[in-house]
């Protein structure tokens, strides 16, 4: 039987490609796990990750932002009392239509005010949406203190981001 060098080269190339893909896929799952555990460090020093281990869609990064004409502007974790509108921006790991997202604004520590929920905003994603934001507007100055936004994905608490009004 005569071996053709072209077929031999093609077979070796195929074996190398398959070996690289297997190695790459194994490394991706490990790097995703390490990225998930570091998400709070990437997005802000004041966010925390509480998602279920088997979550298909999750918040990859989360940030608070100042208002810029009704849209999220500069990223921040500190507002002035006169900043009437605060935005929370969640970047999802992937776009999946029908993902239910809930933003829950809470008072953490404000002098003379009981801790608790301020408001809730719910949204269901459309196709190709992996960035979702919600905002909260107050008609008067914000009381100084600390606040947080909890972000739920499909009913499960995923991430929390803290901010202050100073």
Question: Where are the regions a protein language model picked out?
Answer:
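Sec-dependent bacterial lipoprotein signal peptides
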Residues: 1-18
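Bacterial lipoprotein signal-peptidase II cleavage site
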Residues: 20-38
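Contiguous segments within soluble domain cores/interaction surfaces
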Residues: 51-144, 150-163
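Ser/Thr-rich, Proline-interspersed low-complexity disordered segments
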Residues: 20, 46-54
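Low-complexity, intrinsically disordered segments with a bias for serine/threonine
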Residues: 35-38, 44-48
């Amino acid at each position: 039987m005569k071996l053709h060098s072209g077929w031999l080269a093609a077979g070796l190339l195929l074996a190398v490609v398959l070996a690289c893909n297997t190695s790459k896929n194994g490394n991706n799952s490990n790097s995703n796990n390490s990225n998930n555990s570091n998400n709070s460090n990437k997005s802000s020093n004041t966010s925390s990750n509480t998602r279920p281990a088997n979550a298909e869609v999750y918040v990859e990064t989360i940030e608070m932002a100042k208002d810029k004409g009704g849209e999220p502007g500069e990223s921040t974790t500190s507002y002035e009392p006169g900043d009437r509108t605060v935005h929370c921006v969640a970047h999802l790991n992937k776009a999946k239509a029908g993902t239910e997202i809930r933003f829950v604004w809470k008072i953490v520590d404000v002098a003379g005010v009981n801790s608790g929920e301020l408001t809730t905003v719910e949204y269901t994603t459309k196709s190709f949406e992996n960035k979702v934001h919600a905002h909260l507007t107050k008609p008067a100055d914000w009381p100084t203190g600390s606040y947080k936004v909890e972000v739920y994905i499909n009913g499960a608490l995923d991430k929390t981001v803290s901010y202050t009004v100073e």
